[in-house]
Amino acid sequence: IYPVLVIKNTRLEKEFLDEKYTPLTVVQAVETCKELMSMFNQKGIEVIRVGLQNTDEITDPNIEGSEVVAGPYHETFRQLVERAMYYDMVVEKIKKFNTKVKEVEIRVNPQTVNNVVGYKRQNIEKLKEFYDVDVIVKQDIKYPVEKIDVVVTKEYKDFLEEDEKELSMKK
């Protein structure tokens, strides 16, 4: 799966410079490739490469000598996609709990831990920011590489429940 990069001295570069073509951002490309990889995985189709291999010419557009003018270039693009997929798996598992989750423990194989945690802990930070969930990651060599388990370790108490308990204690 190769997101489109604008390469120097191509027709696409001209269209880009003439503002007739707008490349995807890295975030947009990760989201698109994540959906494609999920679809292929469900069909049992192995994805052997995601994103162009880094070379002297195919590298960050900001580096001198790069032939890439614009587009969703990242030297570890596949890992960004895989980490986004693991984030979605964790969120899906958390949403299945019929409770207000305050803290979870994620159990993973040590080979998978980087995908679960995310680049610069982004997945952990997003869980805290968007779902107000604290995360403890436990590594277990017994877990298969692709498997993760999410266990609720703390729940938020409903303020109405707390008020009812206080009232019944006062009686």
Where are these regions (language model features)?
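Short, basic, helix/turn surface patches
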Residues: 22-34, 160-170
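Radical SAM enzyme core and accessory elements
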Residues: 57-171
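Conserved C-terminal portion of the radical SAM core fold
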Residues: 1-18, 25-56, 97
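Alpha-helix N-cap and loop-to-helix initiation/capping positions
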Residues: 20-28, 82, 119
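A generic membrane alpha-helix/interface feature
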Residues: 18-20, 62
